[in-house]
Amino acid sequence: MTSTTPKSPAAFTRHRDGEIRAARGTQLTAKSWMTEAPLRMLMNNLDPQVAENPTELVVYGGIGRAARNWECYDKIVESLTNLNDDETLLVQSGKPVGVFKTHSNAPRVLIANSNLVPHWATWEHFNELDAKGLAMYGQMTAGSWINIGSQGIVQGTYETFVEAGRQHYNGSLKGKWVLTAGLGGMGGAQPLAATLAGACSLNIECQQSRIDFRLATRYVDEQALDLDDALVRIAKYTAEGKAISIALCGNAAELLPEMVRRGVRPDMVTDQTSAHDPLNGYLPKGWTWEQYRDRAVTDPAAVVKAAKASMGEHVEAMLAFQKAGIPTFDYGNNIRQMAKEVGVENAFDFPGFVPAYIRPLFCRGVGPFRWVALSGDAEDIYKTDAKVKELIADDAHLHNWLDMARERISFQGLPARICWVGLGQRAKLGLAFNEMVRSGELKAPIVIGRDHLDSGSVSSPNRETESMKDGSDAVSDWPLLNALLNTASGATWVSLHHGGGVGMGFSQHSGMVIVCDGTDEAAERIARVLHNDPATGVMRHADAGYDIAIDCANEQGLNLPMING
């Protein structure tokens, strides 16, 4: 007899050996492509080429998971396998909690991850829930099943470096070098992005295994033996005008202050360690990784205290570089906030990357549009690359990005591509991809999604919505409206998360994914979703008073009652 008594949450399994890879080809394991797609993308998130720690269900970003535990993962797989095209699966913090009758144009999956009532939205309370098996940290694309590995952030980082070069170095980073840290799931994009932007880079990472992975996947070019060796290499390559990325195993909280003491002068300074999560993402100065992980279990308060103190020293070094006239910016990991909490009162003297370099793109709905070939065949991606060039024929910068991506970026898991495009362009591309599936030019359907880091889908006062023109940085109605509109528009799955990127209490954000299966019904959904989704970004920035967004809204015919109604 099957027991009807629920198992205690704490009794579930977080570790399981073995490897998971998404199915390839056209053979369905679910009832339709509408359910096969989320199933494959869930599995793809846990592919060892994609996930940082797949045996623990961790995809990236400290403890960003794809499912709450292995029992939940198994039930999600079972539910998706049996789901009908007029049903919707509800997932609550990585746990499948219900299947409901809806309709064929409704999302097949609705996901809510890590959401806490604001007064309780702290790491301390979340970690209590997590330890009891009652919550899961979904990061952004981990719990929403649309992670594509480091490629997912390469172009955004590249665009940031290019714009910084335009603002500070007359449009060229040749002979310049970037100092940064963190080579995890997101930070691992930095060395390749710097290289593609024409700069050398020195990338500090405390785990040798992460450096090894970035070397193997060609995201970083070489590893230095120590700081002296790294600086010799940097001097040589910058003098030669070469864009070479160098990894250095060490602790940024020790190495950046040492470089300040030596009078070293990078040309740009940033950071992408997992500082948003001091318990799981930032190695304290003077500690070994083993000590750090052991004490995270036995004395978490001491770990958090030591990690934040080290972040304070790290940020003080970044401030010293800024004071010396070196362009310095936060790359969205909330390290400034952590430093301020331990007494670095001027931690926010250097800006975040969005207000400094990216916001004009967001005003036009331009952001990280990504797609994945469910066939598993790289040729499907190359054919879509060509289609993007055909349909957006006059954008040499975009064409250059696609050429560089094909040459330099290794696929992780299912073949995928990302490119930053905006309102009008996204729907055009999605409809074209759907026609390519219909005609048989592509071997299997394509899924289109994006990072939650996008123009209309996130409220994060220390990152995407920092220093908004009207002071609305912390207003989080916008990602909720984005999720609701994507649901009403017919996205295949929609997610609403809290705490991604910058940690508990500091962000709310939403995601969507839509399947191009070549049908007329898909085309109708694609036209709605891929117009409405970026349009919410234009709306949000127009509402805040940005002229670029207001002009874009008028050009695109958006009906914004308080702006142009």
Curated annotation (Swiss-Prot):
Coiled coil: none annotated. GO terms for biological process: L-histidine catabolic process to glutamate and formamide; L-histidine catabolic process to glutamate and formate. PROSITE patterns: UROCANASE. InterPro entries: Urocanase, Urocanase-like, Urocanase_C, Urocanase_central_sf, Urocanase_CS, Urocanase_N, Urocanase_Rossmann-like, Urocanase_sf. Residues 463-472 have a biased composition (Basic and acidic residues). It catalyses: 4-imidazolone-5-propanoate = trans-urocanate + H2O. One of its GO terms (molecular function) is urocanate hydratase activity. It holds the Pfam family Urocanase_N. Its EC number is 4.2.1.49. Residues 453-472 are annotated as: Disordered. Its cofactor is NAD(+). Pathway: Amino-acid degradation; L-histidine degradation into L-glutamate; N-formimidoyl-L-glutamate from L-histidine: step 2/3. Its main location: cytoplasm. Induction: By cold. NAD(+) binds at residues 61-62, 139, 185-187, 205, 210, 251-252, 272-276, 282-283, 331, 501. Binds 1 NAD(+) per subunit. One of its GO terms (cellular component) is cytoplasm. The active site is at C419. It is found in: Cytoplasm. It is an enzyme of class 4 (lyase). Catalyzes the conversion of urocanate to 4-imidazolone-5-propionate. Belongs to the urocanase family. NCBIfam families: hutU (TIGR01228), PRK05414.1 (NF003820). This is Urocanate hydratase. It comes from Pseudomonas syringae. The gene is hutU.
